[in-house]
Amino acid sequence: MLPIQRKISPYNHYDYNDPKYIAIHYVGAQSSTAANNATYFFGGDRQASAHYFVDDSSIWQSVEDRCGAWHVGNTRTEVNNRNSIGIEMCCLAPNLGVTEKTEQNTLELVKYLMNKYGIPLSNVRTHYQISGNSKVCPNWSANNWARFNNFKNKLAGVNVSAPSTSNGDVV
């Protein structure tokens, strides 16, 4: 697994989170990297947030796992901002697509978080599923369940090493 770079935002999060779910999102902006997104959310009140941003070559953490990010809302379903971890995949492929490498890095991060928090595979969901089908996120989730099912099948078989650690910059 890639090292997790940290740029923890002082904005847009709750002081409490009890991770029982993982919500998969996509950034929705073409060619925006994980580092760009972490910097953007670090820079001010954006009225949204996510725990992690993932691209082809890096993973950036923007909100502590123990804090609730503003990524799925609080009242619509059993999954909410205070019991889930939000992961945003960056869109580096054409037409707001997610590359295979970004998807693989996301799989490894999700597997690591599942192991760390005891989250079952059934509790890994897309934002689309959580929102009651009102938010097409990731962009392939509304009309390509085969891709998400394949993502979850891969997830069931991914072996992941723990991320490296060093002087506060990497988890």
Where do the protein language model's features map onto the residues?
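Hydrophobic faces of well-ordered beta-strands that scaffold small-molecule active sites
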Residues: 24, 85, 124-126
